[in-house]
A protein has these predicted regions:
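Short hydrophobic/Thr-rich beta-strand motif most characteristic of the beta2 strand and flanking loop
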Residues: 33-40, 48, 110
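Conserved acidic carboxylate
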Residues: 16
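Active-site beta3 strand of CheY-like receiver
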Residues: 52-58, 63
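C-terminal output helix
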Residues: 26, 114-123
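Acidic catalytic/metal-coordinating carboxylates
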Residues: 20, 41-44, 67-73
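The feature encodes the CheY-like receiver
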Residues: 64, 73, 82, 94
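Charged docking surfaces used in two-component/phosphorelay signaling
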Residues: 23-31
Length: 129
Protein backbone atom coordinates (compact mmCIF):
# COMPACT_ATOMS: atom_id res chain seq x y z
CA UNK A 1 0.00 0.00 0.00
CA UNK A 2 1.47 3.33 -1.05
CA UNK A 3 0.99 6.61 0.73
CA UNK A 4 -0.01 9.76 -1.17
CA UNK A 5 3.65 10.79 -1.40
CA UNK A 6 4.48 7.60 -3.32
CA UNK A 7 6.39 5.95 -0.47
CA UNK A 8 5.39 2.55 0.78
CA UNK A 9 3.32 2.77 3.94
CA UNK A 10 5.16 1.61 7.06
CA UNK A 11 3.93 -1.66 8.53
CA UNK A 12 3.25 -1.94 12.26
CA UNK A 13 2.52 -5.16 14.14
CA UNK A 14 0.34 -4.49 17.21
CA UNK A 15 0.58 -7.22 19.87
CA UNK A 16 -2.06 -6.44 22.50
CA UNK A 17 -4.43 -8.89 24.21
CA UNK A 18 -6.98 -6.21 25.22
CA UNK A 19 -9.45 -5.96 22.32
CA UNK A 20 -10.26 -2.29 22.94
CA UNK A 21 -6.62 -1.21 23.19
CA UNK A 22 -5.65 -3.26 20.14
CA UNK A 23 -8.46 -1.71 18.07
CA UNK A 24 -7.64 1.80 19.32
CA UNK A 25 -3.93 1.46 18.49
CA UNK A 26 -4.70 0.06 15.03
CA UNK A 27 -7.38 2.69 14.27
CA UNK A 28 -5.09 5.56 15.29
CA UNK A 29 -2.15 4.16 13.31
CA UNK A 30 -4.29 3.52 10.21
CA UNK A 31 -5.64 7.08 10.39
CA UNK A 32 -2.02 8.24 10.15
CA UNK A 33 -1.35 6.19 7.01
CA UNK A 34 0.24 3.10 8.55
CA UNK A 35 -0.60 -0.50 7.66
CA UNK A 36 -1.31 -2.53 10.80
CA UNK A 37 -1.47 -6.20 11.68
CA UNK A 38 -3.30 -6.81 14.98
CA UNK A 39 -2.30 -9.79 17.13
CA UNK A 40 -4.41 -10.69 20.16
CA UNK A 41 -2.56 -13.79 21.31
CA UNK A 42 1.14 -13.44 22.08
CA UNK A 43 1.70 -17.08 21.13
CA UNK A 44 0.95 -16.10 17.52
CA UNK A 45 3.08 -12.94 17.57
CA UNK A 46 6.37 -14.23 16.17
CA UNK A 47 4.79 -16.21 13.32
CA UNK A 48 2.57 -13.26 12.38
CA UNK A 49 5.54 -10.92 12.60
CA UNK A 50 7.64 -13.07 10.27
CA UNK A 51 4.80 -13.20 7.72
CA UNK A 52 4.01 -9.46 8.01
CA UNK A 53 7.62 -8.17 8.04
CA UNK A 54 6.85 -5.10 10.19
CA UNK A 55 8.82 -1.86 10.22
CA UNK A 56 7.85 -1.57 13.91
CA UNK A 57 6.43 -3.87 16.59
CA UNK A 58 4.21 -2.47 19.35
CA UNK A 59 4.33 -5.03 22.16
CA UNK A 60 2.16 -5.26 25.26
CA UNK A 61 4.30 -6.62 28.08
CA UNK A 62 1.51 -8.26 30.12
CA UNK A 63 0.10 -10.94 27.84
CA UNK A 64 -1.68 -14.15 28.82
CA UNK A 65 0.24 -17.37 28.17
CA UNK A 66 3.56 -15.68 27.33
CA UNK A 67 5.55 -12.70 28.53
CA UNK A 68 5.98 -9.74 26.21
CA UNK A 69 9.57 -9.56 27.47
CA UNK A 70 10.18 -13.12 26.24
CA UNK A 71 8.67 -12.21 22.87
CA UNK A 72 10.91 -9.15 22.55
CA UNK A 73 13.99 -11.24 23.36
CA UNK A 74 12.94 -13.87 20.81
CA UNK A 75 12.29 -11.22 18.13
CA UNK A 76 15.72 -9.70 18.71
CA UNK A 77 17.32 -13.14 18.16
CA UNK A 78 15.30 -13.79 15.00
CA UNK A 79 17.20 -13.04 11.76
CA UNK A 80 14.02 -11.72 10.08
CA UNK A 81 12.75 -9.61 12.98
CA UNK A 82 15.82 -8.33 14.78
CA UNK A 83 16.01 -5.15 12.68
CA UNK A 84 12.41 -4.18 13.57
CA UNK A 85 12.34 -1.73 16.47
CA UNK A 86 10.05 -2.61 19.38
CA UNK A 87 7.86 -0.15 21.28
CA UNK A 88 6.84 -1.78 24.57
CA UNK A 89 3.65 -0.72 26.34
CA UNK A 90 2.71 -1.77 29.85
CA UNK A 91 0.18 -0.97 32.54
CA UNK A 92 2.61 -2.01 35.26
CA UNK A 93 5.20 0.73 35.14
CA UNK A 94 7.11 0.20 38.36
CA UNK A 95 10.64 1.07 39.33
CA UNK A 96 13.06 -0.95 37.24
CA UNK A 97 10.45 -1.97 34.65
CA UNK A 98 11.82 0.31 31.95
CA UNK A 99 15.33 -1.08 32.52
CA UNK A 100 14.06 -4.68 32.24
CA UNK A 101 12.12 -3.83 29.09
CA UNK A 102 15.10 -2.11 27.46
CA UNK A 103 17.39 -4.97 28.55
CA UNK A 104 15.06 -7.37 26.70
CA UNK A 105 15.72 -5.36 23.53
CA UNK A 106 12.90 -2.81 23.24
CA UNK A 107 13.98 0.50 21.73
CA UNK A 108 10.98 2.39 23.12
CA UNK A 109 8.70 2.24 26.15
CA UNK A 110 5.33 3.76 27.08
CA UNK A 111 3.29 3.31 30.25
CA UNK A 112 -0.47 2.73 29.98
CA UNK A 113 -2.80 4.43 29.70
CA UNK A 114 -1.20 5.53 26.45
CA UNK A 115 -2.29 8.87 24.99
CA UNK A 116 -2.36 9.33 21.22
CA UNK A 117 0.21 12.16 21.18
CA UNK A 118 2.99 10.26 22.98
CA UNK A 119 2.14 7.07 21.05
CA UNK A 120 2.52 8.79 17.68
CA UNK A 121 5.67 10.63 18.79
CA UNK A 122 7.26 7.33 19.88
CA UNK A 123 6.16 5.54 16.69
CA UNK A 124 7.59 8.26 14.45
CA UNK A 125 10.84 8.47 16.43
CA UNK A 126 11.41 4.71 16.15
CA UNK A 127 10.52 4.56 12.46
CA UNK A 128 12.76 7.50 11.60
CA UNK A 129 15.60 6.45 13.90
Amino acid sequence: MKQANGHMAKRILVVEDNDLNRKLFCDVLKSQGFVTEPVGDGRDALDKARAFAPNLIIMDIQLPNISGLDLIEAAKKDPVLRASPVLAVTAYAGRGDEDRIRDAGAEGYLAKPVSIGPLMAAVRALLEG
